């Protein structure tokens, strides 16, 4: 059965490119994992897959099992005796199937549609509480194929999903930046959800301000509040704002997260030999908790869990 073992499916959508859908998808996944949920990420941005890079596994490859394709593991579930348990995190992306990470994907619509259908039917996810689907911008062939396939194999009705053992298409999280050019395109994505009868779970206003890496204070460099205003106007739940987080950027780029502290005597520091940086070998899930944006996504994750599981 397609998506066997998957309980809830959440789409991450935006009508505009460059608003941070992939980073929002990953941070939601990490936050849900830290809530003890088993999470999968399905990256259907076929021409620009970002998830392999964000999780630091660009050289990983998808393996085959009798049950189907096996997702690439990012984090294994843990049962901590001294702290809260964490769930597992796995992901699937076309980036894991490319011969070389620099290969361009130049496909027409029918081939994209076939690939998405294969992702939704041939992957052995196992027991997965939440499957987050990272989508490309706009409403293209990928979105149409995704909606058609999910509305056939899954259901938006919680009672029907529980009774029939089918996955539940819980809804879509819409991502925008504060600027009007982004919110105007997200309105089209809302219209897409209405026409396809996919519920909307809420709006996240990403890149809303800049979080200082030293103290965490948020400064509104550009405009702010556009996502909230759009959500209120369209009657959609507003989940919250996320500022630009330098620490998260350092995390996904493979660098060490800096604590933001500087030496009082710069001249003395310049004369000293630099000490080798200690390698932080903690799992990605644990390192993410050091990011300024984590408390915000922790709140988003709890809200989604309450809205979806409580429905």
Curated annotation (Swiss-Prot):
GO cellular component, as recorded: cytosolic [4Fe-4S] assembly scaffold complex
GO molecular function, one term: metal ion binding
Residue numbers spanned by region Disordered: 255-281
Entries under InterPro entries matching the protein: Mrp/NBP35_ATP-bd, NUBP2/Cfd1_eukaryotes, P-loop_NTPase, YlxH/NBP35
Binding residue positions for [4Fe-4S] cluster: 212, 215
Cofactor remark: Binds 4 [4Fe-4S] clusters per heterotetramer. Contains two stable clusters in the N-termini of nbp35 and two labile, bridging clusters between subunits of the nbp35-cfd1 heterotetramer.
Gene3D superfamilies assigned to the protein according to its UniProt record, in alphabetical order: P-loop containing nucleotide triphosphate hydrolases
Biased composition (Basic and acidic residues): 268-281
Principal subcellular localization: cytoplasm
GO biological process: iron-sulfur cluster assembly; tRNA wobble uridine modification
Keywords, alphabetical: 4Fe-4S, ATP-binding, Cytoplasm, Iron, Iron-sulfur, Metal-binding, Nucleotide-binding
Localization annotation: Cytoplasm
Family the UniProt entry places it in: Belongs to the Mrp/NBP35 ATP-binding proteins family. NUBP2/CFD1 subfamily.
Assembly mode: Heterotetramer of 2 nbp35 and 2 cfd1 chains.
Name of the protein this chain belongs to: Cytosolic Fe-S cluster assembly factor cfd1
Organism: Aspergillus terreus (strain NIH 2624 / FGSC A1156)
